[in-house]
Curated annotation (Swiss-Prot):
Keyword field contains Hydrolase: no
EC number: 1.1.1.94
Keywords from the UniProt entry: Cytoplasm, Lipid biosynthesis, Lipid metabolism, NAD, NADP, Nucleotide-binding, Oxidoreductase, Phospholipid biosynthesis, Phospholipid metabolism
Pathway(s) it belongs to: Membrane lipid metabolism; glycerophospholipid metabolism
A GO BP annotation: phospholipid biosynthetic process
Gene3D superfamilies membership: N-(1-d-carboxylethyl)-l-norvaline Dehydrogenase, domain 2 (1.10.1040.10), NAD(P)-binding Rossmann-like Domain (3.40.50.720)
Known role: Catalyzes the reduction of the glycolytic intermediate dihydroxyacetone phosphate (DHAP) to sn-glycerol 3-phosphate (G3P), the key precursor for phospholipid synthesis.
Protein encoded by which gene: gpsA
Record field: catalytic activity: sn-glycerol 3-phosphate + NAD(+) = dihydroxyacetone phosphate + NADH + H(+); sn-glycerol 3-phosphate + NADP(+) = dihydroxyacetone phosphate + NADPH + H(+)
Species in which this protein is naturally found: Corynebacterium glutamicum (strain ATCC 13032 / DSM 20300 / JCM 1318 / BCRC 11384 / CCUG 27702 / LMG 3730 / NBRC 12168 / NCIMB 10025 / NRRL B-2784 / 534)
One MF term in the entry's GO annotations: NAD binding
Lineage: Bacteria, Bacillati, Actinomycetota, Actinomycetes, Mycobacteriales
Name the UniProt record assigns to this protein: Glycerol-3-phosphate dehydrogenase [NAD(P)+]
Record's subcellular location: Cytoplasm
Cellular compartments per GO CC: cytosol
Length: 332
């Protein structure tokens, strides 16, 4: 048993807190709002983000970051990618010095083009060997319901990866390890953009051939970007690559796919946001930062470019289709 702090009480953070608890650890979940923390403490349910799921009575919940982080051996960072830097700056002096930091965020930081593990290292000044990434085909509600799933723990330090692996292994949750942090993060960040494309396609009324083509060619451009950044090619055929991509592109539980469907049906970004309680899918923001990074590195990512066009340049879906189908002929 280890002491685990989960910083962030959204659907995924709450789910991972449940998994760590079910695996027999002492877990504290941090919620920014005391109102939410109090509700979870009293009802053992996160009605805002994970309604209908009963949380373990052993799970501690607080709105005090200092209280949540005290004595933690594993600190799970369940914070959206573009908010991670600001939160870490607040917690920097409170995070235990030798704790393993586990990133759940899937994105590339706007402006800096940094991966989330790089943001963590820069802000906290933690050695990269202390920073792990958890990623895979992990739709929160299915896991919270106890449906079997697998994931990847990527960390340069294999012993730390194994520590997290042992701590998060539950009867319904099987973690694997690798050392390819770059590939694991690139797969997780880019799949949100491809899922938006699949959602747009579905919302527009297109079928499974289109969906399969977007997933397959989407994986190809993700792997191109990963290779340029030094990732291991094998990562993209594994859980953090193809596994995560298929789940996110195919499931109605995927926020990115669902948001894309609304765009495909002709809704504006603002209307789609209103329909999702003011939340913008991660892929909308990531499409810009990933497109900018790809452009900077000279990596061809046509699907990402098209999604960026729809989300940020008022491109019509019909023009997106023409742009992708009208590209020059080439070998696969």
């Amino acid at each position: 048993m280890v002491s685990v702090s989960v910083m962030g009480a959204g659907s995924w953070g709450t789910t991972l807190a449940k998994v760590f608890s079910d695996a027999g650890n002492a877990v504290t979940l941090w919620a920014r709002r005391e109102e939410l923390a109090s509700t979870i403490r009293d009802s053992h349910e996160n009605r805002d983000y994970l309604p209908g799921i009963t949380l373990p009575e052993s799970l501690q919940v607080t709105s005090s970051a200092t209280e949540a982080l005290e004595g933690a051996a594993i600190v799970v960072l369940a914070i959206p990618s573009q908010a991670l830097r600001g939160n870490l700056a607040e917690w920097k002096e409170t995070i235990p010095q030798d704790a393993t930091l586990v990133s759940l965020a899937k994105g590339i930081e706007k402006g800096t083009h940094l991966r989330m593990s790089e943001v963590i290292a820069e802000v906290t000044e933690a050695d990269p060997s202390r920073i792990a990434v958890l990623s895979g085909p992990n739709l929160a509600r299915e896991i919270a319901e106890g449906q079997p799933a697998a994931t990847v723990i990527a960390c340069p330090d294999e012993n730390r990866a194994k520590l997290v692996q042992a701590a998060v292994a539950a009867p319904y949750f099987r973690p694997y390890t690798n050392t390819d942090v770059v590939g694991t993060e690139i797969g997780g960040a880019c799949k949100n953009v491809i899922a938006l494309a699949c959602g747009i396609s579905h919302g527009y009324g297109l079928g499974e051939n289109t969906n399969a083509s977007l997933i397959t060619r989407g994986l190809a451009e993700i792997a191109r970007l990963g290779a340029t950044l030094g990732a291991d090619a094998k990562t993209f055929s594994g859980l953090a690559g193809m596994g995560d991509l298929v789940a996110t592109c195919s499931s109605p539980l995927s926020r990115n796919r669902s948001f894309g469907e609304r765009l495909g049906q002709g809704e504006s970004l603002e209307k789609a946001r209103e329909a999702t309680n003011g939340q913008v899918a991660e892929g909308v923001i990531s499409s810009q930062s990933i497109f900018d990074l790809a452009t900077k590195l000279g990596v061809e990512m046509p699907i990402t470019q098209a999604v960026y066009g729809v989300c940020h340049r008022d491109m019509k879906v019909t023009d997106m289709i023409v742009a992708l189908m009208g590209r020059s002929k080439k070998a696969e």
